[in-house]
Amino acid sequence: MLLLPLPLLLLFLCSRAEAGEIIGGTECKPHSRPYMAYLEIVTSNGPSKSCGGFLIRRNFVLTAAHCAGRSITVTLGAHNITEKEDTWQELEVIKQFRHPKYNTSTLHHDIMLLKLKEKASLTLAVGTLPFPSQFNFVPPGRMCRVAGWGRTGVLKPGSDTLQEVKLRLMDPQACSHFRYFDHNLQLCVGNPRKTKSAFKGDSGGPLLCAGVAQGIVSYGRLDAKPPAVFTRISHYRPWINKILQAN
């Protein structure tokens, strides 16, 4: 299966799709996921797009590398992205640290750190999310959760409110139809017998397993049939630590 970076997706709809939209899920209790970040991105070509992400430090958000753009604004403390609340914190990104080995053809190393211009204020609606150590290799079979503001169906519009779905970590063989899937770098997520999945639109959101962010929404099939591919965060812990320590 041909893999394409997000900007080329609309030109090659027969090939593949970005992951990120929540299909088969339910609306989250407002502000029950205080680490969630909504990213508004202005691309180098001019049009805007959106992604998900999550706060790992008061001044750093973790997301997918294919969510990079000319400029990014992060909204924290949101539930309904069309109704501004007192809980909102809108922060400018001053530096984008896309993984140096990110490959737009294979989507390997699809991970990026965003440094915020100002530190977020930690509140009941805004908080940080722990992420795994380098050697925390989460096994197949585990049930995890992913959240986002994307579409609730292939032909449906995006959701105004934060949605969440429970997904199973699959054996690597379940993602063998993805030509470049690499079990060391990525997670295979979602039971193919279910209609629950992440799909295009809110890539960059966290896969939460037992309270720890183990994955980042990366890509999946155009028809939204699971499983989808998530970046395996534990593999990148040394790189994350290096960026955080230097900034």
UniProtKB/Swiss-Prot annotation:
InterPro entries: Peptidase_S1_PA, Peptidase_S1_PA_chymotrypsin, Peptidase_S1A, Trypsin_dom, TRYPSIN_HIS, TRYPSIN_SER. Residues 1-19 form the signal peptide. CDD domains: Tryp_SPc (cd00190). The keyword Nucleotidyltransferase does not apply. GO terms for biological process: proteolysis. It is an enzyme of class 3 (hydrolase). SUPFAM superfamilies: Trypsin-like serine proteases (SSF50494). The active site is at residues 66, 110, 203. Keywords: Disulfide bond, Glycoprotein, Hydrolase, Protease, Secreted, Serine protease, Signal, Zymogen. Glycans are attached at residues 80, 103. Pfam families: Trypsin. It is found in: Secreted; Cytoplasmic granule. Belongs to the peptidase S1 family. Granzyme subfamily. GO terms for molecular function: serine-type endopeptidase activity. The keyword Membrane does not apply. This is Chymase. It catalyses: Preferential cleavage: Phe-|-Xaa > Tyr-|-Xaa > Trp-|-Xaa > Leu-|-Xaa. Disulfide bonds join 51-67, 144-209, 175-188. Residues 22-245 form the Peptidase S1 domain. Its main location: secreted. It comes from the Eukaryota. Its EC number is 3.4.21.39.
